[in-house]
């Protein structure tokens, strides 16, 4: 198997080929093509939720946030194409919506300029929840008089 098989399987949602790759050599899921795109980039760009769900458990945070030669992450592609469910999966796996590409555009920006409202709502909810978690610790400290 080579990286082209992985890219094809993820771009075309060929789950049979993807299962074969996972069974024979799951470490291949981290590989990237000559443009820096991974299978996760392809599946995210094309809205293949089942593929993203299948491969995320094999990927670490570094791979989930990997940038291609244009600086785009899988989150950039999912956001600009309006794939909110994929953005949610990426966020839950440690994806960072603030990473900027070489044009200084983040996934949040890409979703906003393309009027991807579901994605924007998801990012807003994520930021609010993240802020709440951070503030909860501060509130407890305040209550304890620290």
From Swiss-Prot:
Database matches in InterPro entries: Ankyrin_rpt (IPR002110), Ankyrin_rpt-contain_sf (IPR036770)
Keyword list, A-Z: ANK repeat, Cytoplasm, Nucleus, Repeat
Repeat (ANK) residue spans along the chain: 1-31, 35-64, 70-99, 103-132
Subcellular localization, as worded in the UniProt entry: Cytoplasm; Nucleus
Keyword Transmembrane helix on entry: no
Record-level GO cellular component terms: cytosol; nucleus; preribosome, small subunit precursor
Any one GO biological process: ribosome biogenesis
Chief location of this protein within or outside the cell: cytoplasm
One Pfam family of this chain: Ank_2
PROSITE patterns: ANK_REP_REGION, ANK_REPEAT
Protein name listed in UniProt: Ankyrin repeat-containing protein P16F5.05c
Annotated source species: Schizosaccharomyces pombe (strain 972 / ATCC 24843)
């Amino acid at each position: 198997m080579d990286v082209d098989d992985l890219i094809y399987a993820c771009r075309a949602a060929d789950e049979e080929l993807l299962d074969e790759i996972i069974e024979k050599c799951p470490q291949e899921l981290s590989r990237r093509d000559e443009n820096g795109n991974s299978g996760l980039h392809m599946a995210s760009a094309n809205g293949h939720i089942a593929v993203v769900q299948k491969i995320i458990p094999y990927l670490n945070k570094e791979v989930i946030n990997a940038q291609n030669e244009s600086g785009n992450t899988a989150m950039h592609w999912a956001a600009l194409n309006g794939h909110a469910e994929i953005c949610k999966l990426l966020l839950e796996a440690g994806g960072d919506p603030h990473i900027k590409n070489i044009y200084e555009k983040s996934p949040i920006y890409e979703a906003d300029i393309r009027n991807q409202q579901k994605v924007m709502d998801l990012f807003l909810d994520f930021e609010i929840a993240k802020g709440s978690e951070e503030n909860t610790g501060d509130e407890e400290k305040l209550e304890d008089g620290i």
